[in-house]
Amino acid sequence: MYLFGFGSLVNIKSAQNSFKNRELKKEDLIPVKIRGYKRVWNSIESICFEKEIVNGIFLNIQKDENSYIFGVMIKISEEEFEVLKLREKNYSCITIKKESVINQKLDDDLIAFMTTKEDKIAKIGQENCFIPSRYIEIVKEGVKNFSKEFQDNFEDIFSNFPFEIKEGIYTFS
């Protein structure tokens, strides 16, 4: 079974937080190109910035037949999948068909966690919504470790921010 990561999971240090029982190595994060999806800033998570609760906006994916995205796939066990489901409880677990993966021949489909619940999808102009600058840094740091084509695929989301960026340390509330 493979997990597809399209945001902070492209950063090995961040991904390691999801895998407490094994040490991830660089080669565990396999770059993949997937047809039929695009990356968007619209996933709401309640976060705390210096004692202030706000809606943090994080990366999400959505279906788009005319697009493709890069991300990483990580081979996971059934036990790791169960732990991930708990950690990603606000997300829907979706299946990405192995045929959608352009640059790898796979035996299995991939799973991914994406926001699909209406109340967890941010609308442009919605109040009290901020993209944490630290999250942007985490994703950018991870992207640096991959090919130019991989990096270029993230270019658009790093230049068009639909919500205000908020500096500082945050925690999930």
Where are these regions (language model features)?
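A glycine-rich, hydrophobic/aromatic-adjacent loop/helix-cap motif
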Residues: M1-S173
